[in-house]
């Protein structure tokens, strides 16, 4: 069976190094580095993998090259959700089968690349590996919809434009809902309930989500008043970021063990509990 080795550019804390159920986060061996570099050489690319580079190793992946970008996105998304500062960046992907590297792909640098990232306090190797597994399970269950959730959240996290960031974050969160619920009121109320918030906290959360959706709607329709709402939202982007991470984490954990229809029923039930 194939395994994907996604090589990082950022320093992964040693407390997150480990292996569980075929998943691993660890430094590449000398033999693995040579195998990846040889595969690049075979493609006419004299690329070097720095000594000590760490890889996220994902088991049971398909060998189809068209699926590699989705693997990169889901790992970048998984890291972004549990990151406190910085944004994860990756150097290369190697697909290994029976100990041999069969495919490689270089990952270009981004302006948002961060050499150092801090992760949430208390996160362990086991916790990170289980989170990666859950993200991949949700991806298999949701297919294209999970790609929208992950891709748009990553774009939000990397965006240098407040307008683009707000649009991408809102689309990421919209993908959690059924198309019939994508109106401002239901968007804010449904997602606020996903957090388990009650009373004043739920009201405050719903108001913030409503402002997010209103900004997205105004931007999409070219409303001149969008700039005023963006100025209002800009200082609250860190709060929106934390809230979105909480909502999306709940979504991924639920969908890794349930169907999309069960998720819709769960949201509906939460409105009356």
PLM feature segments, named:
Residues 1-164, 233, 241, 246-272:
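Charged, non-catalytic interaction/linker regions at domain boundaries
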Residues 145, 161-165, 184, 201-205, ...:
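Residue-level recognition of alpha-helical structural elements
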Residues 146-149, 162-169, 173, 205, ...:
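Short runs of predominantly hydrophobic/aromatic residues within well-ordered alpha helices
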Residues 153-157, 197-199, 225-230:
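Glycine- and acidic
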Residues 167-203:
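Flexible secondary-structure boundary motifs
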Residues 181, 214-224, 249-257:
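Charged/polar positions within long, soluble alpha-helices
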Residues 191-195, 214, 256, 260-262:
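Extended catalytic cores and adjacent scaffolds of nucleotide/polyanion-binding enzymes
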Residues 203-231:
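Histidine-centered, metal-coordinating catalytic motifs and their short helical/loop contexts
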């Amino acid at each position: 069976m194939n395994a994907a080795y996604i090589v990082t550019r950022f320093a992964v804390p040693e407390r997150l190094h480990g292996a569980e159920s075929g998943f691993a986060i660890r430094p590449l061996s000398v033999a693995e580095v040579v195998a990846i570099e040889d595969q690049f050489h075979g493609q006419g690319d004299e690329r070097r993998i720095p000594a000590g580079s760490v890889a996220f190793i994902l088991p049971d992946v398909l060998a189809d090259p068209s699926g590699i970008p989705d693997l990169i996105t889901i790992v970048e998304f998984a890291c972004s959700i549990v990151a406190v500062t910085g944004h994860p960046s990756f150097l290369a992907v190697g697909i290994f089968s029976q100990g041999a590297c069969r495919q490689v792909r270089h990952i270009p640098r981004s302006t948002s690349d961060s050499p150092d990232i801090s992760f949430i306090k208390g996160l362990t190797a086991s916790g990170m590996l289980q989170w990666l597994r859950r993200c991949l399970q949700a991806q298999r269950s949701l297919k294209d919809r999970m790609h929208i959730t992950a891709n748009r959240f990553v774009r939000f996290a990397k965006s240098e434009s407040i307008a683009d960031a707000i649009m991408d974050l809102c689309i990421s969160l919209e993908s959690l809902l059924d198309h019939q619920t994508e109106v401002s009121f239901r968007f804010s109320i449904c997602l606020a309930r996903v957090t388990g918030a009650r009373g004043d906290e739920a009201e405050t959360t719903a108001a913030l989500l409503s402002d997010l959706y209103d900004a997205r709607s105004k931007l999409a329709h070219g409303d001149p008043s969008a700039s005023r709402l963006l100025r209002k939202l800009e200082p609250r982007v860190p709060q929106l970021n934390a809230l979105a991470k909480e909502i999306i984490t709940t979504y991924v954990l639920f969908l890794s063990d349930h169907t999309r229809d069960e998720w819709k029923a769960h949201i509906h039930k939460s409105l009356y509990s």
